[in-house]
From Swiss-Prot:
Catalyzes the ATP-dependent transfer of a sulfur to tRNA to produce 4-thiouridine in position 8 of tRNAs, which functions as a near-UV photosensor. Also catalyzes the transfer of sulfur to the sulfur carrier protein ThiS, forming ThiS-thiocarboxylate. This is a step in the synthesis of thiazole, in the thiamine biosynthesis pathway. The sulfur is donated as persulfide by IscS. This is Probable tRNA sulfurtransferase. One of its GO terms (cellular component) is cytosol. Transmembrane segments: none annotated. SUPFAM superfamilies: Adenine nucleotide alpha hydrolases-like, THUMP domain-like. Keywords: ATP-binding, Cytoplasm, Nucleotide-binding, RNA-binding, Thiamine biosynthesis, Transferase, tRNA-binding. It comes from the Bacteria. Gene3D superfamilies: 3.30.2130.30, HUPs. The gene is thiI. SMART domains: THUMP. It is found in: Cytoplasm. GO terms for molecular function: ATP binding; CCA tRNA nucleotidyltransferase activity; tRNA binding; tRNA-uracil-4 sulfurtransferase activity. GO terms for biological process: thiamine biosynthetic process; thiamine diphosphate biosynthetic process; thiazole biosynthetic process; tRNA 4-thiouridine biosynthesis.
Amino acid sequence: MYNYLLIRYGEIGLKGKNRSYFEKSLVKNMQSALKDLEIGKIKSTQGRMYIPLSGSSDELTRVLDRVTRVFGIETVSPAVKVESDLEVIKKTALQVFKNHMDSISPQNQVSFKVDCRRADKLFSKNSMEMNQILGAHILDHVPGLKVDVKQPQILLQVEIREDGTYIFTEKIPGHGGLPIGTTGKGVLMLSGGIDSPVAGWLAMKRGIQVVGLHFHSYPFTSQRALKKVEDISQVLSRYGTGPTGGFKLITNHFTDIQKAIQNYCSESMWVTVMRRFMFYIANRMAQKEQAMTVVTGENVGQVASQTLESMHAVSQDVVNLPILRPLAGLDKKEIMSKAETIGTYDISIRPYEDCCTLFLPKNPKTRPSLEQTKREISKLNFEELVEESLEKTEIKYFEPYQDITEEELTFDV
């Protein structure tokens, strides 16, 4: 039934002189998300974007699932576009209204409201007149209705524009934010836990093109632990659709570094020294990727390694880029809820431990000093261990919609 998808954006509309750059980026990202579907050209006009549809419900389901994951979009509406003729508008508005009625299967009397906006000033009727005409037409043809202008169960919206009239009843929320790629590139320190995927998602929401960096310690950590991270990367790829598409995961083989730390460093400092190595490698990877930031899933005070003293000790002097910690102000419950929304939670709780979990000492140092950390690292051949680790790096790309099943689609239209 629906032949267009209306796209509304929020923050992009406030960008002033740079607005066109953000709008073009949003269009490119939507095109990237829909590249394997036979979709017509996306149009942009008068603060709206329009995606043409064939009218197939299967197509609408797929397009909605993908478009609502693209950052920068505030809401979307499946709409029927018709010529701006009064009788055609009346007939179509009634069809759209009945279609929505059928989808909600009301048990009691239904309240409704018509909200018409006339952007085309050459149209013969004004907005108020159209509200009255369409409201009366619906009341005449659908029994058991009542008008409620404050809290209607069904809001029929009509936009009369220069290129035609758009009729719809739904505003489906997107995730807002900024189009990916508009604010730069970052390297995400990605574990298999709950936190780091959410941190990466939040960085993406602010327009950052994220590259994942995972530290793998085979055989201490299993291939199933790595598969867990790859599955998380697959989920993130569906949100990370920027102009280049997909999600890039860099896997750094960290085993030899962890062995050296375990053999030569004080047990209470294992985590601190290990994380300092990780930050140094992340900084090197960021430089190689021409990224401008390192993103982590650290929170403040959530675990022993996340005190302010510890954060200072693990990153000071080894990272010369901004470090983003999007979760710093969130409670664990909030992070878990967001992980469920994103779709990474069920993957993250699989019982396969990552390299940080396996090497936890009995009594970790919670407030290590930078000097103490440097003394521990001086026991190791830091540069040699790092270079050997970098030589064992692997890269894998994840396409956002490869092998997607019907059950994974979000919308049932």
